[in-house]
Each structure stands twice: as C-alpha cells, then as structure tokens.
Amino acid sequence: GAVLNVQSDHLGLKGIDTLDQLAEVKRVVIEVAKDCAVLNADDPLTLRMSGYTDAASICYVTMTPQHQLVREHVRAGGRACALEAGVNGQMITLYDKGGHMPLLWTHLIPATLEGRATHNVQNAMFAAALAFSLGIKLDAIRQGLRTFDTTFYQAPGRMNVFDEHPF
C-alpha cells in the first residue's frame, strides 16, 4: 500500500474536516498492507503512518536527497526511492539492501514536462517504488516511466498540453 500525501484539497468531504482526520482515513491503506508500505518521507502526516503497519518492509520516498530518516533507513539496508541531483538533471534512484540503483532522469518522463512538473516527478517516484516492491524488473519500470504521459487519451483533464490550438 502507498500514501503519497495528506493535503487540504480533500477536506470537507464525508465529515472529514481536519488534516489529522484525513490522515487517519488514509492510514487504513498502510494498516492493511502486507508486503510493503510506501510512504512519503517529506510529508509529516504520512511519515507518522510508519508506526501503524505490519508490512514486511517500508519504502520511503523523498525528493530531499539528504533526508536524515531516509538516509538512516537506507544505511540499515531499508528500501527507499530518492531524487538525486546529477550532471544531466534529477535522477530517480532506488535503494534496497544496501544497493544503489539509478533508475531514470526525470526529464525523460513525458508527464514531468522535462522534470518541471514536480508533482508528476513524485507520482513517478511512487509508481517506481511500488513496482520495485512488487518485484518488477528495473528495465520494465524504466520503460513504464518513459511512457508515462498526460496526453488527452491517456489522462483526460489532467494537465493535457495542446500544441495545435491557436492560443
């Protein structure tokens, strides 16, 4: 299971009026996870959910390469997905059992608009972390990310770019 964030855009629905209430609802996903719980280390409300899972492992996702908790988790052999700066831009990198696996430059993922759409960089990182946790091979994850786009046909109404229009 994975929880990307707890933000106010979902408040006011079905009696959920505070971020703490929303975090409690979203935490159910982590409570029932068996194999791996994938959590956003950059979101304090999501990070707290790590104490509520019996999953076999936890994978932290961070866009902050020097995140102290994630660094300690990786040093202890834990799984993580981190964004790292490199000579060609930002690299999505996986860590597991002491291994360091550079995955893909963010500018090569179409939905990230050459790495500028950071929300889709984060979405791609979570997709990669989940896929890796399910045993998907790195080359298959790379191929999936290279085809992650926001065209009208793949994701209607979600950041679609139309170059053909005169405006």
Each language-model region and where it sits:
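Flexible active-site lid/hinge loop adjacent to a nucleotide/diphosphate
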Residues: 1-60, 65-72
